[in-house]
Amino acid sequence: MLASPLVSSSASPKITLGCVAAAALLAASISGCGGGEQQDANEPSGNYEVAISKVSFPRRQGLGETSKLVITVQNTGQSEIPDITMTVNGLNYRSTEPGVADPLRPVWVINAGPINGTTAYVNTWALGPLAAGDERSFIWSLSATQPGTRTLEYRAGAGLGGKARAVAADGGIPAGTLVVNVTRRPQDSTVDPATGQVVQKGE
């Protein structure tokens, strides 16, 4: 007569713990899904018209030379852009040397990026909202570290969350490329006596 209560009491906690564990797992799963949705909850959805109005970067550079990359964008639409962004590919290359911990190697060292523009993405910068008709410039200080013919690809965006999309006037993506020749020898330079500015020969 004593055996039945013992079996009953030992089985009951097992069922209860299993139910609790399953419920906890389900709750965690639901909570995790909700957290992901909230990351870009404040970013509006839609297309925002953007024009790349100016790009400045020396097409010929010497190894070790420091140059300024300037990309200016304009909001050519009627609505404020939530967060104007710029993605630049080609600042690094992937090394094929075996056994290296990090295969990415710099083609240009970034001495300074756009002020207050750092994001969680290594090749994307953001400069905040941009009102209709306004312009904003992304400016980098870059030093060439690898010789050869190099290509930079740049693309404007309207937000980091993926809901706001930048489009050109023709409906395409506001983007472009720059082809730069980096020589092994530093560029010769002179000082313009009229302006006092340093001028690189060959530009």
Features from the language model and the residues they span:
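Bacterial N-terminal signal peptides that target proteins for export
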Residues: 2-20
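C-terminal motif of bacterial Sec signal peptides marking the signal peptidase cleavage site
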Residues: 29-32
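Low-complexity, acidic Ser/Thr/Pro/Gly-rich terminal tails and inter-domain linkers that flank the onset
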Residues: 36-65, 179-202
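Short acidic/proline- and small/hydrophobic-mixed sequence motifs that coincide with surface turns
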Residues: 79-83, 96, 149
